Amino acid sequence: MTTAPRADASRFAKGTFAPAPQRSDMAKLVMSQAWLETKLFWRHGEQMLLTIIIPLAMLIGLVMVPVFELDHPLERIFPMVLAISVMSAGFTGQAIAVGFDRRYGALKRIGASGVPPWGIIAGKIVSVCTTVTLQYILFSLVGLALGAELSIGGWLLAYVGMLLGTFVFTSLGLLMGGTLGAELILGLANLIWFILIGATTYVAVAPSLDGISSVLLHLLPSVALTDVISAALAMSVHWSAVGVLIVWGVLGAALAARWFRFDMPND
């Protein structure tokens, strides 16, 4: 009976076959998570309805059909629709998605795969920014087809404003989605979405507003984002609206960092 020759241990350096587990590169980890989040986001019909179909229908319908007596409807409707699209993707979409991910234990399972909590949140933020970028390109093309006059400088400045709005609404969406129950989130997120759309549309088409009602309406994040985008498209900066957005964003991010949970309390 013959035996196989033994390998010469001197052929391999000591430790060659020793396990060396380590975390993946941070940038690669975040981008992989963002790609996963983006694919999941666009596979949901409700997300498509909130982020693309409804805002697009509002843009085309309110410009083509004289529902409101506006001298230049596109100048008022276009910034408003952009703000609503950001709110839909960052707030309503994320709140509902995160809430049901928590409800069914998806976030816990992702965490068990080695992705840290900050990686999950960062991936969601990058995913929303990607969605908002695609929205902006699509709605800009439709706006141009409807007769909008967009300068390169104003278009880029408005994009910066939309990214600021993305930070604000995503932080608020993560706050709601990471603290409440899934069923409550579903109803409350949609209710707030409808209220903010109504307030933003009212401000955009109203002939003039003054007094305390005007002040209160312009403190809403959706109205403030509309003001920022409208000013940016005209190559200007609406500093008071920027300040309102920063306050909302910092407040939402701070509260989300403090109270966000990756599972339901009874899990």
Language-model features: locations:
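Transmembrane helix segments
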Residues: G61-F68, G177-L219
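Transmembrane helix-boundary elements of multi-pass transport/secretion proteins
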Residues: P19-D25, L29, Q33-Y104, G153-A158, ...
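Alpha-helical transmembrane segments and their short interhelical loops
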Residues: P117-L188, S236-I246, V250-A254
